[in-house]
Amino acid sequence: MAADTTSGVEHTDDGRHIVVDGRMWRATDPLIPEGRRAELVSILMAWRREVRRTHGARASRDGVQAAKVALGERGTPWWEQSEDERRARWETPVESPES
């Protein structure tokens, strides 16, 4: 396994997963432009706060799901998609809570 020198996060050799406390999680799609990635991460974190605030309301959990799909962390694995499919996924609008 290789460490990402920019974030300190350990990745599997194929780059498809990160390793946190010995557990593998799907990595964010590396083709997402940095600005859009930052926007999606911000939306994801807002939805996570909303999950806590609403004690896990379905709409809040659905918001987390939508953001994670857009980031490539859930849904069809990004390495199985064409570049056009990947671009369409991250360009799909993802609402913020209370927007």
Name each model-derived stretch:
Residues 2-99:
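Extended, charge-rich alpha-helical interface modules
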